[in-house]
């Protein structure tokens, strides 16, 4: 059980980082320091962006549950 939670935690951590990096910068913030402040000609969210948002939230939820699971296993070991 502990090994499965740790593997899930590692996989979801990597996925969250990759999914966040795939998001398009929406202006402002630190992305403008690195040239990310350029506006595109297409405004609004596409279906791909909405699905990417949903997938990011889903993977983040799994990540959060695995963090809590590992913490509980450590506490009640």
From Swiss-Prot:
It is found in: Cell membrane. The keyword Cell membrane applies. InterPro entries: SecG. It holds the Pfam family SecG. The keyword Transport applies. One of its GO terms (biological process) is protein secretion. GO terms for molecular function: protein-transporting ATPase activity. Keywords: Cell membrane, Membrane, Protein transport, Translocation, Transmembrane, Transmembrane helix, Transport. It is a multi-pass membrane protein. This is Probable protein-export membrane protein SecG. It comes from Mycobacterium bovis (strain ATCC BAA-935 / AF2122/97). The gene is secG.
């Amino acid at each position: 059980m502990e090994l499965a939670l740790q593997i899930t935690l590692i996989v979801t951590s990597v996925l969250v980082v990759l999914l966040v990096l795939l998001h398009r910068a929406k202006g402002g913030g630190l992305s403008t320091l690195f040239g990310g402040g350029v506006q595109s000609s297409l405004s609004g969210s596409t279906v791909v962006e909405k699905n990417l948002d949903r997938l990011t939230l889903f993977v983040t939820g799994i990540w959060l549950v695995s963090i809590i699971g590992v913490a509980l296993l450590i506490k009640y070991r």
